[in-house]
Amino acid sequence: MTQCGDRRLFALNYHGAIQTPPPTDPNAAPAHRPAPRPALGRCRPPHRRRRRLRPPVRPPLSLPVALTTRSSAAQVGYLQDPFASLLYRPPMPQPGAFAPQAVGRARKPPLINVGTHHRTWGIDRLVDRFLQRGGKQVVSLGAGSDTRFWRLMSRATPPDLARYVEIDFPHLTSPKAQRIARHRKLYQYLGPSSTAMPPPGHPYTVSKGGTQLSSPLYTLLPLDLRPSPSEPASSISAILSHHVLPQLDPRLPTLFLAECLFPYMSPEDSREIIKWFGETFCSCMGVVYEMVGLDDSFGNVMKRNLAVRNLSIPGSIFSTPESQAGRFTSPMLQGGKFDSAGAKTLWQIREEDVGPEELQRISKLEILDEIEELRLVLEHYVIAWGTKGECMSSISL
């Protein structure tokens, strides 16, 4: 594959923007495709007006793509994640049909696997340092099928967490709740974190039509953070206060995670989320992961292919690591302003944090010749963080 081809595949596959269809034989006869059957519930009389739906905050494919990239990295040996296969199993494609899930299931190119390793390495270090400083609560925004809770609680010495809350759309929390309830390897960790033995029976309750799962330690919360058009007086901060705050203790040090979420929100909405956490918790930390520098050819490819699917990234105006860090210390946050902030690209994390032994280990897993190409890709993704409170002040990468 050419360098340009590698770059395009990484830009679209790794971030979850769109999948590239498999190559076809130009000399092959065109396959017969039956006429598509109408979807149930979508046949409407011509005179009826179609109800307008709000676009999703992030691409619908970002959930399976994000998890399959992680599964690919774990399969090759970059990561250890025994829970990914329990939380997501892509459906089998129909014979002769192109399905994005089938592409997502395949092993990813080395560029993507290395990027997934560095992303996980950096965020894991920040989360661990938060917990080592007495952090007690974690809120994962747009969690999808993230496995971090289980990776933390399955450690030989699990952290002393008080609450772990995952938030996403109901159509995404529903299958996750079903899989948690189905697998004892998942629900055995839902009890109090101080207990080494799994609690008897099922330590959780399922509600809201199967979209919410709650336990003394863990909550999977179905929630759309966007204000409803039917309630113009509502705001993101009001939604967070009404639905999320009852799950937490504002007196405890709290971390919020937003991985590939804010680009699909307006800068005003993401600022309101950061401000709410800074105002609500006197000791707080935020970690954001997203892309930067999208004004070059790499970013233009991503934006063009998102536009094909009628998706945009209005929150991608923070084009440098410095501007990403500045989101936490902006005067516009007023009382929600964080005390300190920082940011690093994945390339900086590779150069400064991963370490020679780990780099040597992963270099033996796959052949990766184009280091300059890798650098170009990794410099377009950044991990930014902000801290507030005395015990959180020195946390950084």
Curated annotation (Swiss-Prot):
Recorded coiled-coil stretches: none
EC number: 2.1.1.233
Function statement: Methylates the carboxyl group of the C-terminal leucine residue of protein phosphatase 2A catalytic subunits to form alpha-leucine ester residues.
InterPro entries listed in its UniProt record: LCMT1, Ppm1/Ppm2/Tcmp, SAM-dependent_MTases_sf
Gene: PPM1
Name the UniProt record assigns to this protein: Leucine carboxyl methyltransferase 1
Stated family: Belongs to the methyltransferase superfamily. LCMT family.
Swiss-Prot/TrEMBL keywords: Methyltransferase, S-adenosyl-L-methionine, Transferase
